[in-house]
Amino acid sequence: MNRGMKPINELISPDTKHYSFTEPFQTELGATLPSVEVAYRTWGTLNEARDNVILICHALTGSADADQWWGGLFGEGCGFDATRDFIICSNVLGSCYGTTGPLSPNPATGRHYGPDFPLITIRDMVHVERHLLRHLGIERVKLVVGASLGGMQVLEWGALYPEVALALMPMGISGRHSAWCIAQSEAQRQAIMADALWKDGWYEEDAPPARGLGAARMMAMCTYRSFRNFEEKFGRQRQEDGTFKAVSYMHHQGGRLVERFDANTYITLTRAMDMHDLGRGRSGYEEAVCAMTQPVEILSIDSDVLYPKSEQQELACLLPNSKILYLDEPYGHDAFLIDVERVSRMVRDFLQAISRKG
């Protein structure tokens, strides 16, 4: 297993921009962050009317570099067309790709936050994104789009800022995190904490809990794909050294994440995902979802074992102005990252439909 995360400048684009809050930020649960810095990327040009904005929300281990992890959606005539639209993607609060999170310095102690970084919610992430848009002079977003953790943000954008988020496209997600997903995340967190190098979250920069984080990623990958996908891709095939190809793939994925992600960050963000519930603190789940009247297209993945299509169907039944689209692929939850041609077409078609309605 690799020893740890590469330097941040090797992991994010040199085109990354940064915005620093001028005042402290109070989280939904009452903690105060004295300062917040947001890393973000933009593509295209903001038009004179400032109404050609698309906001992309990234998933758990993603970054603001949407043109890298969702590159197949970028290009003229594609879902994200920088000749037509002004496209924004920011790294979420609590992450490790330039936005304030556990790796950031804590002004109160002079060292990084580590496990002292406060418990945050999806709503906190969205509020931070709203701050960024205000800084950019943007008051309307014609489409907010994202999958998984990104899809949670999309839905909260619709609930928190309906006057800004004019249309929504959540993918591979539910309106509230299920017990199944919460249990999966807790098992992954416990794998990290079981590593001898965890040290209650105060691990050394050059000696992180790499085995634990790698194991957590392996566990997650089993839920990001599907039975059929693993059988078709690996079956019982072996490498030349006799190792099952499925085993080799797991170790490869675990090692790759260790090189580019932080353990405290993984715990922070998965806990935020566990808090996801559109009805929490509102008038109730059904009432909160029914109150979202924007045009919504929900992308459901037939083979998703994390967020089964019954959850997207429930959302579609409650959202008054929604439509559900299906990716009938064997790839599992990660299909939104794999079948980019179809996903791009779906995004493009939704944008055209929004434009026609005016």
From Swiss-Prot:
Classification via InterPro entries: AB_hydrolase_1, AB_hydrolase_fold, HAT_MetX-like
Main location as per UniProt: cytoplasm
Keywords: Acyltransferase, Amino-acid biosynthesis, Cytoplasm, Methionine biosynthesis, Transferase
Enzyme Commission number: 2.3.1.31
Reactions this protein catalyses: L-homoserine + acetyl-CoA = O-acetyl-L-homoserine + CoA
Pathway entry: Amino-acid biosynthesis; L-methionine biosynthesis via de novo pathway; O-acetyl-L-homoserine from L-homoserine: step 1/1
Binding site for substrate: R217, D334
GO cellular component: cytoplasm
Compartments, record wording: Cytoplasm
Record GO biological process: homoserine metabolic process; methionine biosynthetic process
Family listed: Belongs to the AB hydrolase superfamily. MetX family.
Subunit note: Homodimer.
Protein name: Homoserine O-acetyltransferase
Originating organism: Chlorobium luteolum (strain DSM 273 / BCRC 81028 / 2530)
